[in-house]
Amino acid sequence: MEQDRRYLRTQMQKENIIQKLKERGCRITIVPASCTAQQVLDTNPDAIVLCGGAGLEAFEQNPAWKETVAELIKSDKPVMGIDLGHQVMALAMGGSVEKMHCGHRGANCPVTETASGRTFITSQNHGYIVKEIPSCATVSHLNINDKSCEGLEYPQMKAMSVQFIPEAEIGQKNFDGIYERFLGLIG
């Protein structure tokens, strides 16, 4: 599919992510986090992005979100989670999330991509981590400092997620290749 024809849904708004996707020819529609999976899928998006929002506590107040996110991940649409979206996807697929004693905060957090062994300096601002990896996922990125999970891939589904902020990466200019890999999942 041509880049200018890509059409994505985002569950929650994050301007930098939106800008990076627009730079790649994506048309963006933002839907409220209160939408059901069917409401999102009825719009026939090419892909779905789950990103920042009110925080994990807000999701925990509405038990339906877990089912909604699981349905989206299990759909035939590619799904990418960034930051809070990473945590929400892991929880929806049976993983666990834990509050950190000291969060990952700053623009100099080293992360290794497990497939290539390459290490990147990332920007992070989170106080929770995915502790238990869902059985349907594999770790794609690890924090060098504490070996915590910074990214997951869901091999049986068209889904992936990262805890860090890919568009704010420092140094290597192509670490936002995460977007390219995600957009490559669109059929």
Locations of regions flagged by a protein language model:
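RNA-binding accessory domains that recognize and position tRNA/RNA substrates
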Residues: 1-38, 42-43, 167-169, 181-187
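Cysteine-nucleophile active-site neighborhood
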Residues: 47, 51-127, 172-181, 185
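Hydrophobic anchor at the start of a short beta-strand
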Residues: 28, 79, 159
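Active-site-proximal beta-strand elements of phosphoester/diester hydrolases
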Residues: 5-10, 122-123, 160-164
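Catalytic beta-strand/loop cores that center a nucleophilic Ser/Cys/Thr
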Residues: 117-157
